[in-house]
Amino acid sequence: MSKGIVLLAAGGTGGHVFPAEALAFKLKERGYSVHLVTDSRAERYAGKFPAEEIHVVPSATIGSKNPVAVARSLWTLWSGMRAAKRLIQRLKPVIVVGFGGYPTVPPLLAATRLGVASMLHEQNAVMGRANKALAPRVKAIAGGFLPESGDVFSDKTVATGNPVRPAILAAAEQPYLPSHPGEPFNLVVFGGSQGAQYFSKAMPTAISLLDDGLRARLRVTQQVRPEDMEMVSGCVAKLEMGADIAPFFNDMAERLAQAHLVICRSGASTVSEISVIGRPAILVPYPHALDHDQAANAAALAATGGAKVIPQSELSPERIASILSHVMNDPDKLSHMAAAAKLAGKPDAANLLADMVEAIAAGKTVSEFKRTRA
């Protein structure tokens, strides 16, 4: 018999959906039924999501200064809140948990107005706009990188870490095996769940600048956006090297486990997954993020020695080639970075978050939960 329904709400990108998925697996193991509220984009990432049902509720971003666009967005949000209210009244969840992104706004607002227990999980070191708007209303906040002191919402924040998917936990069981000079070197390049055009342009040029011996060692996995596939594939073909190029890899966890070096953006899920698996990384924060959240996430891992942070403006193809030339012949350095990243990882984040969800659903305060955790 189910302990009750937990309604998870997540924006439709991998960065929001993946940690919600990890929590969903834990809650199902504990006897709960899980439903997901999201938007239409999530279908790409929610294929393995263990939800009884996935509900799409209208939502919108209020980012335009155009009065007509703002009015349209407000109407969509109001419609979404009505739909979310009906959904919550029908499902009667014991708690609603939001993972960020504007699709979480209608269900979380509806939950707080209906008196249903509610909490947020913020993946980043800087709170996103949707979560920031909802934070004063919810009972508790779980943080991937948020502090438990010194912040306006610290009194109801628990630093759980970011839950990672079962595939990542399985990959974390594989030790880091360094590549010595002359041996194949696995390089994984990706820009988060939606790709990064910058890497599509920079990496082929950087690899072309390597000497023949180093280039022959490279085994590249590179995620590229669909519109960049033809360009990158053509460049790789000219280089006559081993490479897997695709818009999305369903086995990315295994590819990360095999990596000797990762070059990537620094979204919260990415940083968390790299640290749990324990792989050295060059982190290139997305430069146009409004809240500079990726820079803060990257700094957190770099402080442990598990990664090096390089702003995109400073990372030319020539510099990438120089970095690869050095680290491909310095396995000890990469091994030390891998070990430091592993120490920074929080593989038990999903269990701790599930504990917190159960406590808040049962009516406990954050202070009470912290005391029982100590």
From Swiss-Prot:
Disulphide bridges: none
Topology relative to the lipid bilayer, per the entry, is:
Peripheral membrane protein
- Principal localisation: membrane
Keywords in UniProt for this one?
A: Cell cycle, Cell division, Cell inner membrane, Cell membrane, Cell shape, Cell wall biogenesis/degradation, Glycosyltransferase, Membrane, Peptidoglycan synthesis, Transferase
Q: Does the keyword Cell cycle apply?
A: yes
Please give the catalytic activity noted in the UniProt record.
di-trans,octa-cis-undecaprenyl diphospho-N-acetyl-alpha-D-muramoyl-L-alanyl-D-glutamyl-meso-2,6-diaminopimeloyl-D-alanyl-D-alanine + UDP-N-acetyl-alpha-D-glucosamine = di-trans,octa-cis-undecaprenyl diphospho-[N-acetyl-alpha-D-glucosaminyl-(1->4)]-N-acetyl-alpha-D-muramoyl-L-alanyl-D-glutamyl-meso-2,6-diaminopimeloyl-D-alanyl-D-alanine + UDP + H(+)
Extract the SUPFAM superfamilies matched here: UDP-Glycosyltransferase/glycogen phosphorylase
- A single cellular component GO annotation: plasma membrane
The annotated pathway is:
Cell wall biogenesis; peptidoglycan biosynthesis
CDD domains recorded for this chain? GT28_MurG (cd03785)
Q: Which InterPro entries match?
A: GlcNAc_MurG (IPR006009), Glyco_trans_28_C (IPR007235), GlycoTrans_28_N (IPR004276)
Residues binding UDP-N-acetyl-alpha-D-glucosamine are 13-15, 124, 165, 193, 294
Please name the GO terms of the biological process aspect recorded for this protein, alphabetically. carbohydrate metabolic process; cell division; cell wall organization; lipid glycosylation; peptidoglycan biosynthetic process; regulation of cell shape
Compartment(s) of residence? Cell inner membrane
Q: Name one GO molecular function term.
A: undecaprenyldiphospho-muramoylpentapeptide beta-N-acetylglucosaminyltransferase activity
EC numbers: 2.4.1.227
Q: What does this protein do?
A: Cell wall formation. Catalyzes the transfer of a GlcNAc subunit on undecaprenyl-pyrophosphoryl-MurNAc-pentapeptide (lipid intermediate I) to form undecaprenyl-pyrophosphoryl-MurNAc-(pentapeptide)GlcNAc (lipid intermediate II).
Stated family: Belongs to the glycosyltransferase 28 family. MurG subfamily.
The protein, known as: UDP-N-acetylglucosamine--N-acetylmuramyl-(pentapeptide) pyrophosphoryl-undecaprenol N-acetylglucosamine transferase
